[in-house]
Amino acid sequence: GFQRIPYFGFYAIPVIAELGLPAYGHSALPLPPKFGITFEDLLVNHYQVAQSGNGEKRIKQIQDSHFGYINTGDALPALENLRSIRSEIVKRPMLATLEKILMPLQADGQSFIATTYFHRGYEVSLTEIGKRSQFDRVIVGNGMEGTTLFGVHKEAKVFIQDGNKETQSRSLKYSEMFQEGTAKQILESHEALKEIES
């Protein structure tokens, strides 16, 4: 996750669920090379939720509340067991890309995933992985790393993969999606956040 501006991805999940689409996020505690913000980091270190051993309890909460967060260590212990070797690897391993598209929990109906990439080229590997996944629809957008927040302050490319069909590409332009006043507020807010980073 990106640390220089507020992290809204964690709070987007209950909002999506409130809009009628059950949603969950999965993550582990931060890993190198960036040690960014993760759902698990917020749960454990901010909200004081027990880190592991409560996977079934979290799944029950998702079923009851239609949203929640899964600890990758509970869902995929073999992946969590690679933590020490991942800490020794300086560069970002291929696992960091693959683990975004894991499906530790499957919906009764159709399953969708929305994720982002920051560096160009990752959209190709993510949509190709999407073709081979169990997800019915994979949505990959150019935006902030580690979130489902597409770059509304600029034109964002979104790629939609439905099963084995050809990948569709869409452009999102905040200036065309929002009224002029709202678009101006988005641009001003983004500029203000950039000043905070400095």
Where do the model's predicted regions map?
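Acidic, glycine-rich active-site loops and adjacent beta-strand->loop/helix elements
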Residues: 27-34, 144-145
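Phosphate-binding loop that captures ATP/GTP phosphates
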Residues: 50-61
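Glycine-rich anion-binding loops and their surrounding alpha/beta cores
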Residues: 44, 49, 63-198
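Short, contiguous, pocket-lining structural segments
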Residues: 4, 8, 31, 35, ...
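Active-site cofactor/substrate anionic-group-binding motifs, chiefly glycine-
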Residues: 1-25
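Active-site-proximal loop->helix
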Residues: 31-47
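Short beta-strands and strand-loop turn motifs
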Residues: 24-27, 110
